[in-house]
Amino acid sequence: MSNDRPLTHSEAESSALRLGRNPGLQVRHDEVERSLLTPMLQHYAELKDAYPHALLLYRVGDFYETFFQDACTVARELELVLTGKEGGKEVGRVAMAGIPHHALERYCRTLIEKGYAIAICDQVEDPAQAQGLVKREVTQVFTPGTVLDTELLQPRRNNFLAAVVLSGNHWGLAYADVSTGEFCTTQGSDRADLVAELNRLQPAEILLPTEAPDINRVLRPGEGKDQLPPELPPQWCYTLRSPEDFQAAAARQRLCQRFQVKSLEGFGCEHLPLALRAAGGLVAYLDETHRQQPVPLQNLSTYSLQQYLFLDPQTRRNLELTQTVRDGSFQGSLLWAIDRTATAMGGRLLRRWLLQPLLDIEEITARQDAIAELMANSSLRQSLHRHLQEIYDLERLAGRAGSGTANARDLAALRDSFRTLVSLAAVVANTSSPYLQALAQLPPVIEQLADTLSAALVDQPPTSLSEGGILRPGAYPELDQQRQQIEQDQQWILNLEAQERQRTGISTLKVGYTKVFGYYLSVSRAKLNQVPDDYIRKQTLTNEERFITAELKEREARLLAAQSHLFELEYQYFVQLREQVAAQASTIREIAAAVAAVDALLGLAEVALYQGYCRPQLTRDRQLCIRGGRHPVVEQTLPAGFFVPNDTQLGTGADLMVLTGPNASGKSCYLRQVGLIQLLAQMGSYVPATSATLGICDRIFTRVGAVDDLATGQSTFMVEMNETANILNHAGDRSLVLLDEIGRGTATFDGLAIAWSVAEYLATILKSRTIFATHYHELNQLATLLPNVANYQVVVKELPNEIIFLHQVKPGGADRSYGIEAGRLAGLPAVVIQRAREVMCQIEKHSRITVGLRKSSMGDPPTAPEINQGELPF
C-alpha cells in the first residue's frame, strides 16, 4: 500500500489489522459523505483533493496529524501507532496517525528518503483568536527533489531534481539542485548514455512526461515499472507529468521569463530542442511546488557528455568510486580515500570532479598547478584549513535566503562566514593559482554584508522568528523605543508585589502569571479579609484566591500589545535584512564555488603529500606508462609500506596486456588500480605512483566480476555477455578497457573461445588500451601472433607445501592458476583437495589444445584456437 495510488478497502483494512488496530476505521476520505464529516475533517478532505499524491500533514495544536489512507501510510512507514479520531456522528472513527511538531523534520526526512511527497498544512492564525475553525493553509510542499530545508538534506551530496524528455533514441536531460541553485541541461542520441548520466547524478526525483491519466503520480523506487520506458531503471523516484509542460514553445517562453532574457542563445540550448524542453518542464514543476516563493536558480548551463571522460554505470560500480561493491558503504570507496575537504561545498564538488573527469589538458593542468602550489607551502595549507573549517555551507544558505526560508541562525552563519572570507582573502593574496586568486579578489559587497549583518544580528540568535530576540539593541531606533516601553511596564509589574504588600498589609501577597489568565495577585484564604475593595476576583483555588485590578489589566494589555508589536517590527526588519542577502545570492554562490574548489584542491594536496603521490604528465597520445603504481584505497587499509607497487606500460608497443596468475594473487586489484590512476589523473589529482605519463582517455570500461540479475531474469553469464557487448560496441582506440575473467560463466571451451575472440577483436579492430586478466593460459598464444599483445603474470613463490603470493606483475605468461592451492588455503577438506589433484592429473594427460594457424575472419593473420578434448577416464 502506498500513498501514490488509491487504496482498496481490503488493502486499508489489512493495513489496519497489521498495525494492530480496529479494521472498522474509515480509511478512505473519498468514500465518505463529505457533509457528514466534522468541519476540520471536511477541510482536510478538501486539501487532500488538492494534493492527492502527497502525504498531507495537518497541524492540530502541538501535532501534525494525518487521516484516512495517509494515516495508514504514515503509521506503516514511520512505525507509529495507527489510532482513530471521531469523524462525525454518522461517520464513526477515521484512521489517524500523528507526529509531534518538534519532530517534523526528522519524520519528513524519513518519508522523503522513502520517495514520498509531503504537503505541510500549518495553522496561519492564533487559535486563541480564531472565530470557529482555526484557519489553516498548505504552506510547504516537499518532494524528494525539491527539498530546501538543510535538515532534510545530506550535507556532502547534491539533491538533484531531474527531468527527462525522450524522442526515439534521442533524449534531453535537465537537472537542478534547488538547495544550491545549480541548473544544467544536455541532450544525446543514445539512451544508454542517458542512463549513465542519471547514474552519475543519482537524482532524488525524475520528472517524466507521460500520456497516462494519473498526472503527478509519484512512482516510488521499484514501483510502476510498467509505466516507465524499458531503459529507465525503476530504482529511482519518478513523478509523472503532463506533456504540455514539456512542449518546446512553452518551455522556451518559461525559461526566457525565468531568466529575464529574450533568447536562450547565451545559455547554449537554443538549438537543442530536447534539452530545452526538459529544462522548461523542470522549471514548470518548481513553479508549481514553490508557488509562494520562487526557487532562485543559477543561469542555465548547457554541457555535452563529450566534454568529460565517460564512465558507464558498471565502471562506476566496479571501480568503487563512491561506495563499495560488497556492502555499498562509503568507507572503502575511492571518494573515502581522497576526501579531506573541510566544507560541505567542497565535499560536493570533489564528488562531482570524481564522477566527471576532464578531457581538457589545460583544465587538468590548472588543478595540478594549484595542488603543487599548496603542497609547497605548509603554512598556507594550515591557514587555509583553519579558515575553511569556519565557513558554513554558503551555497545552500544563499538558496535559503533567496527562497525566503532562511532563519536568523542562517543569516548569522552567513555573517560569520563572510568575516572569515575577508580574513581568508588576505591569506591567499600572494598566491599565483587562479583557483586561489579567486578568493583573493573578494567582491566588496561581501564585506559590506558582513558589516550589515554584524551590526543587526545578536551574536547567537534563536531559530524561531516569531518570538523576538533576533536583532541587536541599538541597531533599529524604533525597536529600541518599543523595548524601552516594555521594560518600563515589566518593571512596574515587578514593583507591584512590594507596593501591594505595603498597601494591604498582606505580607504573603504574590504577583503571578499564567497563559490563560495573565497577571494576577495571589492572596491566601487566611488573608481574604484584608483584600481591598478595588481587587477584582478572577479565580478561586483550594488555598488561595486570585485577583486583578483595573490598573494591572491595563498595564498587562499594554505590555502584551507592545510585545506583539515588537515581534512584528522585529520580523519586518529581519525580512528586510534577509532580502538584502537574497539580492546578492548569485554573488554569494560564485564565492561559494571558489571556496569549494580551493577546499577540494587543498584536500587533494594533503592526500598527495601524506600518501606519496606524484604529479602525472598528461599527453594527447595513447601512452599509458605507470611506474610504481599503487591502489589508492587498498594501500590506505594496509600498514605503511605493505602494498606492493607495480608498473604498467600500454599504448606504445602493446595495446593489450594478457594478465595471468593464481587466484587471489591480486589481478583484480591491479586492474582497478590502473583504472583509478587514470581517472584520478584526469580529475586533476596527483596519483599513487612513482611516476606516470598518461594519454588522455575518452572512456574507461570495466568488466570485473558478475552476479545474477534476478530482477531481469539474467544469469551471471548473460550479465557478463551484456557488459562485454557494451564495451565492444562503444570502445575506441582512446579508451581504457579493463576485463577480468571473460567467459568463465559457461562451459570451459565455450568460454575460452569467447575470451580469445574478444581479446582478438580488442587488439586488432578497436586497438583499445586493454588489460585482459584471465585463467585461460591459452590466450598467452596471442602474443606470439599479434605484435600489439604482451603477456604479463602475477608471480608467486613456490615452496614444497605452499605458495607465497608476491603480488608482483612481471613480463611473461603463467601456465598454472594454483586453484587447488587456493581451495586448500580457503579450508576445503583434505579429501576434497586430494581428489581434485587426482582429477587435475587426468585432465592434463587426456585433454589437449592445439593452435592451428588460419586466417582470422577479423582480418589478417591472427589465429584462433583449435580445441580437441580427449575422452576423460573419470
From Swiss-Prot:
InterPro entries registered for this protein in UniProt: DNA_mismatch_repair_MutS (IPR005748), DNA_mismatch_repair_MutS-lik_N (IPR007695), DNA_mismatch_repair_MutS/MSH (IPR017261), DNA_mismatch_repair_MutS_C (IPR000432), DNA_mismatch_repair_MutS_clamp (IPR007861), DNA_mismatch_repair_MutS_core (IPR007696), DNA_mismatch_repair_MutS_N (IPR016151), DNA_mismatch_repair_MutS_sf (IPR036187)
The protein's role, per its UniProt record: This protein is involved in the repair of mismatches in DNA. It is possible that it carries out the mismatch recognition step. This protein has a weak ATPase activity.
Residues annotated as binding ATP: 661-668
The UniProt record lists the keyword Hydrolase: no
GO cellular component: cytosol
HAMAP family found in the cross-reference section: MutS
Gene3D superfamilies from the UniProt entry: 1.10.1420.10, DNA repair protein MutS, domain I (3.40.1170.10), MutS, connector domain (3.30.420.110), P-loop containing nucleotide triphosphate hydrolases (3.40.50.300)
Molecular function GO labels: ATP binding; ATP-dependent DNA damage sensor activity; damaged DNA binding; mismatched DNA binding
Top-level taxon of the source organism: Bacteria
Full protein name: DNA mismatch repair protein MutS
Keyword annotations: ATP-binding, DNA damage, DNA repair, DNA-binding, Nucleotide-binding
Basic and acidic residues bias (residue ranges): 1-12
Gene designation per UniProt: mutS
Pfam families recorded: MutS_I, MutS_II, MutS_III, MutS_IV, MutS_V
GO biological process assignments: mismatch repair
PANTHER family according to UniProt: DNA MISMATCH REPAIR PROTEIN MSH1, MITOCHONDRIAL, DNA MISMATCH REPAIR PROTEIN MUTS FAMILY MEMBER
Annotated spans, Disordered: 1-20, 854-874
Family assignment from sequence similarity: Belongs to the DNA mismatch repair MutS family.
